[in-house]
Amino acid sequence: MSGVGPLERVRGSFEKQGLMALLGAEVVEARSGLCVIEVPLRDELTQQERYFHGAVTGAIAATAGGYAALTRAPPDREVLTV
């Protein structure tokens, strides 16, 4: 994805992620070394005390970290988290 800015690059990949779509997540900012993802709080994503379930938090943290790395990666590379 040569010639595109960090936000466009991240969103282009992000839109292919089924889990992020299921969560209703959205990339609201991406620049060199940073990616901000927002998820609306819904009952289906909470634990018994109405906070986000840890699995949601972990998935968003892993995804945001991976995309922050992608903003620093060469245009012909992808980044995966495991």
Residue ranges and their predicted role:
Residues 1-82:
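Terminal targeting signals and extreme-terminal segments of soluble enzymes
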